[in-house]
Amino acid sequence: MSFPYSLKPFNTFGVEQSCLSLIEVHSKAELQSACLSLYQSKRPMLVLGGGSNIVFTDDFNGTVVRVLSKGISCSEDDTHFYLAVEAGENWHELVQFSLNQNMPGLENLALIPGTVGAAPIQNIGAYGVELCDICDWVEYLDLASGNLLRLTVDECEFAYRESIFKGSLRDKAVITAVGLRLPKAWQPKLAYGPLQSFTAETVTPREIFDRVCEVRSEKLPNPEVLGNAGSFFKNPIVSAATYMQLAARFPSIVGYAQPNGEVKLAAGWLIEHAGLKGFALGNAGVHAKQALVLVNLGHATGQDICRLALHVITRVNEVFGVKLEAEPRIMGLTGETSLDV
């Protein structure tokens, strides 16, 4: 079977796989039309944003729909700014836009790769802020009915790297636009690492933005130089009792207390202290500067990356008794599959 359309330019791991057909949509109407037609034909379909959260382990025997719809509209009331953003907008460019319009609140989420439409699926987050903190609504195409529907932030069932779009609406919905709600009474979020040196009373949104960009650029390799999908593993959440046991054995372990009493562990710390920082398996490697990131060292296949990920998961579990979970979607011949190759 022939797969004439290369997907290498459209996935940040730079994996060389192809697909049967490729459609680029530049408006919400085109996105609706293309996705409904494909859904009704019952052919495999993959809706792709920036390709920054995906690992292709095979050619895709179906149609890839690249979402390139653009548009940002702004409004406000006495207390909030509101942004309605089309799914194909670049996330980091949206962060820059909001700052330039003096609408702060997104600065902690600077330099997260990908599109706005992909952001709600895994409830993107960084440096103490998650999408759910600033999301107002999510509009999506209901594939079964063909209708555009809108969910409130509560209806999205957001959790750490989770949402209804990974749950009951998986494969049933295509996100078309996202609404954001930014308080005019801006309050800096400075709880995490490199932001703790700032003073809440004097820091500006631009200073936070610049620091986040600086730190991410230092730690995360440029995908155009070294293929990667950013953080490959979720930070595991454990009980307070488990954390205390681990801290007794590993006093320098990094953990962040959660509102419900559980503790979020730093997956990068676990990987590094399992001796895997800079480790390579074939053409896939654990990044030498940030162990949370897996990289394509040159001509790695999706299978290479998955094999390395499974090795990391096994080793961390052996050392710490903690099971890591992969963040990216693993795409096989006809659709999403599991990490096991």
UniProtKB/Swiss-Prot annotation:
Reactions it catalyzes: UDP-N-acetyl-alpha-D-muramate + NADP(+) = UDP-N-acetyl-3-O-(1-carboxyvinyl)-alpha-D-glucosamine + NADPH + H(+)
Keywords: Cell cycle, Cell division, Cell shape, Cell wall biogenesis/degradation, Cytoplasm, FAD, Flavoprotein, NADP, Oxidoreductase, Peptidoglycan synthesis
Keyword Nucleus: no
Principal EC category: oxidoreductase
Cofactor needs: FAD
Primary location recorded for the protein, binned into one broad class: cytoplasm
Active site: 161, 231 (proton donor), 327
Role: Cell wall formation.
Assigned protein family: Belongs to the MurB family.
Entry protein name: UDP-N-acetylenolpyruvoylglucosamine reductase
The species this protein was found in: Shewanella sp. (strain ANA-3)
